[in-house]
Regions:
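Bacterial N-terminal signal peptides that target proteins for export
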Residues: 1-9
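Bacterial N-terminal signal peptides
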Residues: 8-18
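N-terminal start-of-chain detector that recognizes signal peptides
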Residues: 15, 75-77, 134-135
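Boundary at the C-terminal end of the N-terminal hydrophobic targeting segment
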Residues: 19-25
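A contiguous strand-loop segment
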Residues: 25-124, 144-313
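Second-shell loop/turn segments in exported
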Residues: 116-117, 126-135
Length: 313
């Protein structure tokens, strides 16, 4: 009887995982120009899903008449979400890249469930593919993503986006702000977010766990963020320290054994393979090199306090 109970529990767990075709198993690797052999920015995008990525979406460049609209269809569920105004010109896209060599990919991490917005139009997939048709550079893409979410609401869970063009590569963590209805409208529309430029010569990886921790508050060349990313966390009771100590991941997607062992461990594995077992990174103006094994207790869930660096070389 005990054996049967174990088998039933295992089958239930498998069903729970496969009920979501994405199964929370995406991995991105971002390689900057100085870290690649041909001086190219590179983004890899993998998902352990048998029902996704069997196609490449193609949209030709197009000019649109004034007053044209765009139907927003949820990328995961295919549910119609609503319509938004179309722009005058859209760029040609193939898969997750457009004609200007802008690339956007993602991994989902969920985060605090109370921050989901059930009234919103723009899901994470629509943000990616609409932005690819409207932006030419990574910086433009970040702004378009933010503007779309702020205008039409963000309809998905916490996400990390990989964003790169020919010159720059960025990582962007974001999560919605929940629902607070007033006069039939959500007055918390949009999301809180941080985007960090990956230094040239470095690589970055994320795998269904928010990766940005503390970040520079006065370096717009290399770090952009929502004006309320810290104040909103204070308001919700997620953070009560000094601004300079604010940790996005800790506030909006606290790490636990499951997320570290099943998610950050994949990012660690990418670092370990690509950096030959040695992590070199900058901390407080100093260059630090340490073995990948220094984070073994972290990625096995034994010590959640010793987080990995965001970028390594």
């Amino acid at each position: 009887m005990a054996r049967h109970s174990t088998i039933y529990a295992l089958l239930a767990a498998i069903c729970a995982l496969t009920a979501n075709p994405r199964a929370e198993a995406c991995t991105n690797i971002i390689v900057t120009r100085g870290a690649s052999t041909d001086n190219s920015n590179i983004i890899s995008y993998a998902a352990d899903s048998h029902v996704l990525y069997g196609e490449l979406y193609f949209h030709p460049a197009a000019n649109w008449k004034a007053g044209s609209t765009l139907d927003i269809i949820n990328w995961d569920s295919y549910k119609p979400m609503g319509q938004i105004p179309q722009v005058a010109h859209t760029y040609k896209t193939v898969g997750n890249m457009n004609e200007h060599q802008l690339i956007i990919a993602e991994t989902t991490w969920g985060g605090r469930l109370e921050l989901e917005d059930t009234t919103a139009i723009m899901d994470y997939g629509s943000l990616i593919y609409v932005t690819l048709q409207r932006a030419r550079t990574a910086r433009e893409a970040i702004q378009v993503i933010v503007d779309l979410a702020n205008e039409y609401g963000y309809a998905s869970e916490g996400e990390t986006f990989s964003i790169a063009d020919k010159d720059e590569a960025w990582i962007m963590d974001l999560i919605g702000k929940g629902c607070e209805m007033k006069d039939g409208k959500n007055i918390r529309k949009g999301f809180v977010w941080v985007a960090r430029r990956i230094p040239d010569g470095y690589i970055c990886s994320h795998a269904n766990q928010a990766r940005i921790q503390t970040f520079p508050l006065n370096d717009p060349e290399n770090c952009l963020y929502a004006p309320d990313v810290i104040s909103f966390a204070r308001e919700k009771g997620y953070f009560d320290g000094k601004d300079e100590d604010f940790d996005f991941s800790a506030a909006y997607c606290p790490a636990d054994f499951g997320t570290v062992r099943g998610c950050d461990a994949r990012a660690w594995s990418a670092f370990n393979i690509l950096c030959d077992g040695q992590f070199t990174y900058e901390l407080d103006g100093k260059t630090i090199t340490e073995p990948a094994s220094a984070y073994h207790d972290y990625i096995t869930g034994k010590d959640l306090s010793h987080r990995m660096p965001l970028f390594v070389k």
